[in-house]
A protein has these predicted regions:
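Residue-level recognition of alpha-helical structural elements
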Residues: 3, 22-25, 102
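A short, charged, Gly/Pro-tolerant segment at domain boundaries
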Residues: 163-181
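A short, well-structured juxtamembrane/interface segment
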Residues: 19-35
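Glycine-rich phosphate-binding loops that contact phosphosugars or nucleotide phosphates
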Residues: 38-153, 159-162
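Hydrophobic packing residues in well-ordered alpha-helices of helical domains and bundles
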Residues: 7, 26-29, 51
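Generic N-terminal amphipathic, Lys/Arg-enriched alpha-helix
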Residues: 1-19
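Generic secondary-structure signature for well-ordered alpha-helical cores
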Residues: 16-23, 63, 160-168
């Protein structure tokens, strides 16, 4: 019984956050992704792991994507898009990435729990997942768990939107999936 209560707590909180997220974001994010020459994904800690999920699905969708910090990541240039995932929008390393990307003329998107932040002030687009007041302390969901899981679901919904809008068959996505595993 206790396990079911925990599952309902997690699912309920994620649903609450996603219900409070602007429904126009899917279209706006898709437009920004489509207009980019290349896409770079950055985050720190568990937010970076969420970014890895998103990067993989974007590759399956046919986008040219790199994850910041990997040894094979190329340099970002004008016309590229840097997608930053940061609950606070204040992570020092991600602020530095944002400044460097801005300096070369890349566009910046911030996915965050906050509408206003240092990174958000430099970004070309801010996608606030939920509303700040919904991120209070939740017993059983420590530290950034609520943001990370909500963002993972939000980004999966973006991928679903892209697949639907572009009519990408799963077979095509499978062909783009890694085959050296």
């Amino acid at each position: 019984m206790f396990q079911q209560q925990n599952q309902q707590l997690v699912i309920g909180k994620i649903s609450e956050i996603l219900d409070a997220t602007d429904s126009s974001y899917a279209e706006k994010m898709t437009e920004m992704l489509d207009s980019a020459k290349r896409i770079f994904i950055a985050g720190a800690g568990r937010s970076k792991l969420v970014g890895n999920f998103f990067a993989m699905r974007l590759v399956h969708g046919g986008y040219d994507v790199s994850v910041v910090g990997e040894i094979v990541t190329p340099s970002i240039k004008a016309g590229d898009l840097l997608v930053i995932i940061s609950g606070s929008g204040e992570t020092e390393q991600l602020i530095a990435f944002t400044k460097n990307a801005k300096k070369v003329g890349a566009n910046i998107v911030l996915i965050s729990s906050r509408a206003s932040s240092t990174i958000g002030d430099m970004a070309d687009g801010v996608f606030q997942v939920g509303k700040q007041e919904l991120y209070g302390k939740v017993v059983g969901m420590p530290m950034g768990t609520v943001f990370e899981l909500s963002t993972l679901c939000f980004l999966e919904a973006i991928i679903s939107h892209i697949i639907w809008e572009k009519g990408i068959p799963e077979e095509v996505m499978r062909e783009r999936h890694a085959n050296l595993e």
